[in-house]
């Protein structure tokens, strides 16, 4: 084989001519130490705050502490896959979540990865979990009601679309129940719902998903779950991820969105543990100094957009758990000051059988009144006052002093109002039905109905009116008002129904009669004892 040097040299020359020097610069760092979900990385001089960092073995982290000679970052995955000396790369982007219609009906984690075993979610759109809140000029006042389907809330603590209403109370007082009922009530209301579970038990989230599925609510709902077993960083970004998913529908689809954060107490605890591990100085109750900003920047993203921005809205229902009813603790006071009102649930009311256990005295909606329908505003105007007076008189009545007739009437009316406002779970009520039954109790039409017949009266009355006079609820629904003609017709129907209503004897009367018999027996027994004592005395004498 003859080798021709000139051919070889020409090939080499060609390759040298075509060679282009391309240097790829990658900003990398080295893991100094790792533990408790936190990694300290040397290098990465140009890293951004909250930037996503890539660790080996498919683990990602988020840069939170930008120190002089190292970067403190939290790991969004299994820390056992990261070891000292590993190389860390910058990604040049912040933490993002997938968004889109494809997420509806799914359960995802804080990074938008599916948890429900229904396969991968194929989306082509992503949004950063942290984004600025709409400015003042982008917003408009809250003017449309968001119906919860709960009589006590829609009548006295109305919520508007774009509002932030806090649900606060001790554990096991029905906070999540109110939020879930509100989601169920958005069926056919054209509202997208996002339920964010932070630090909840996985079994609880599965139960809620099952309930929503039973009532056909998963079709318009996304569940974002960062359960108690997830690392603190994933619990920390969960509410922001849920908000980002909601913002996609608000900004790009001009839809109305409802986001439930359940609950922000556990969110603050997760952030506290991260901050302490990052050696940030602790403040009150060991929370870091920026814990107020943690929640304010999240809840400020709720808004009612003006027409130029598409007219969508994002309503936030944050939940806070109190310890022994203490609303003056650090996190509760922070969130109360950020939100547009609060629904306060009391364990005493809950155990007394008043459910939802709302304490109307300290519950308030600061902007929702403007969004309330005219019909509801008209019938529920005196409801809060009547209920407050009843609670006050009830406290006095416990002393057993003689009450005048006016006070007695108020107490009886109050008992009936409390009974009407009770509502079983998963049974939200339409606005027109709420208006009709509240009108009935406020105007004294139930004053002569025994308290234990009220629930039956309500069910039978509403089915009677829908069967025989469907035009009344239809008019209220269509106009959102209770005009004089409809009111007159409604009063006539109430009287007509009451004539045919079969009042069942109060079962308490039988118990009282039994008690009376017992008292008589006791009197006889006491008299016999007295006679015996007298006889003994005579014998002694």
Curated annotation (Swiss-Prot):
Provide the reaction this enzyme catalyses: ATP + H2O + 4 H(+)(in) = ADP + phosphate + 5 H(+)(out)
* InterPro entries for this protein: ATP_synth_asu-like_sf, ATP_synth_asu_C, ATP_synth_asu_C_sf, ATP_synth_F1_a_nt-bd_dom, ATP_synth_F1_asu, ATPase_a/bsu_AS, ATPase_F1/V1/A1_a/bsu_N, ATPase_F1/V1/A1_a/bsu_N_sf
- Topology in membrane: Peripheral membrane protein
Task: Give the function comment from the record.
Answer: Produces ATP from ADP in the presence of a proton gradient across the membrane. The alpha chain is a regulatory subunit.
Official protein name in the record: ATP synthase subunit alpha
Q: Which family does it belong to?
A: Belongs to the ATPase alpha/beta chains family.
Alphabetically sorted, this entry's keywords are: ATP synthesis, ATP-binding, Cell inner membrane, Cell membrane, CF(1), Hydrogen ion transport, Ion transport, Membrane, Nucleotide-binding, Translocase, Transport
User: Record-annotated residues binding ATP?
Assistant: 169-176
Per the record, where are the segments of Acidic residues compositional bias?
Answer: 512-521, 531-541
- What does the annotation say about its assembly with partners? F-type ATPases have 2 components, CF(1) - the catalytic core - and CF(0) - the membrane proton channel. CF(1) has five subunits: alpha(3), beta(3), gamma(1), delta(1), epsilon(1). CF(0) has three main subunits: a(1), b(2) and c(9-12). The alpha and beta chains form an alternating ring which encloses part of the gamma chain. CF(1) is attached to CF(0) by a central stalk formed by the gamma and epsilon chains, while a peripheral stalk is formed by the delta and b chains.
Q: Which gene encodes it?
A: atpA
